[in-house]
Amino acid sequence: MNKALKTLKERGFFQQCTDIDGLSDLMDKESVTFYVGTDPTGPSLHIGHMVPFFALRHLRETGHCGIALIGGGTARIGDPSGKTEMRKIISYEEIDENVKRFENQLNKFIGFDGKTALLDNNKYWLADMNYIDFMRDIGSCFSVNRMLTFESYKKRMETGLSFLEFSYQLLQSYDFLKLHERHNCCLQIGGDDQWGNIVAGADLIRRKTGKQVYGLTFPLITRSDGKKMGKTEKGALFLDPVMTPVFDFFQYWRNVADADVRKFFLLFTFLPVAEIDEIMTGDINKAKERLAWEVTAVIHGKDEADKALAGAKAAFGGSGDTSSMPTKEIASGEFQGGLGVVDLFFMSGLSATKSEARRLVQQGGAYITGNDGKERQITDIAEIVEEKDFNDKGELILRAGKKKYLRLVLQK
């Protein structure tokens, strides 16, 4: 097997391929241009979107050329793959704004140089396309009977599938054809939920040009408990630091299950496999800390990773920079005569209700790091917190349970 494909397989980026032997032979002979697509249906990429883009970087490092295709056109419809109901239709203006955000995030992660990594947008050929011409030229190449055999459609037949969504496969297939014409792209990679769309695109190119192209998919990434990877209590793990603060991003990786650490090292870092295996022979908590730092550094940069690490250490009662932690300002007047811990955890937002805050304290899940720099457990629901409990920076660190932290900053 080709070296680049071995790397993908070794690191967990391989589920199935349309013709692994043919693709391997081609990649041995020449530099292959391939593409990854993503639709800007939200204001930020999340970590689930990034799996194929990590693969893109691995393939680029072995001499191949990757195209990141932003679906400024297909986002106007919405891909039904992996969805149980129709996506909300969003305005063209919102899509265009999302495109700009996606492009900035991907450029930061990939670095588009026009040679080894390219950026394209299917809005350029889809937005003003003539419907009649498209259906005559492209629609005639598709069999409805065959389309209905793909899982992405079969799963939706019982719950309802609009014609708008049903036509999505034609558009994604057309993307592959256009990229083949524009850039000699001969490989599409993506999650395994895209298998039907990828195969359809390869078939379309064969019908139109007589040439063979390839498709390769990755497993859908799940945690060891079977749940979808990259989900938090607050939703998806976004790349936008406003939507997911860097500290929270870091803490997600720091708190993954032991059984997931090696898998996530392989998928979401660029450390050599031998180095990962060496890390895994040591203390598991140190391995998780390293994982959190590495992934945060890849996505947000080394400086932000350092700040998040320092904030995590400070949150556990050690010394360190707390500036990266989720922060809330609170007026000093709230502490005149003292403020009860139940009210404090409720006002901070760490507990949704006062009853929840009371249970948190009673069950031993409430912690404070104050003026002595040491974290302590709150055991008395009647305890009062005063202004003097804040440290000399005017900070008080709260923790609810194992994973929720907040830095309170006193405003005079």
Show which residues each predicted segment covers:
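Conserved nucleotide- and phosphate/pyrophosphate-binding catalytic cores
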Residues: I205-K412
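NTP-dependent nucleotidyl-transfer catalytic core
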Residues: M1-Q194, V199-A202, T209-Y214, K227, ...
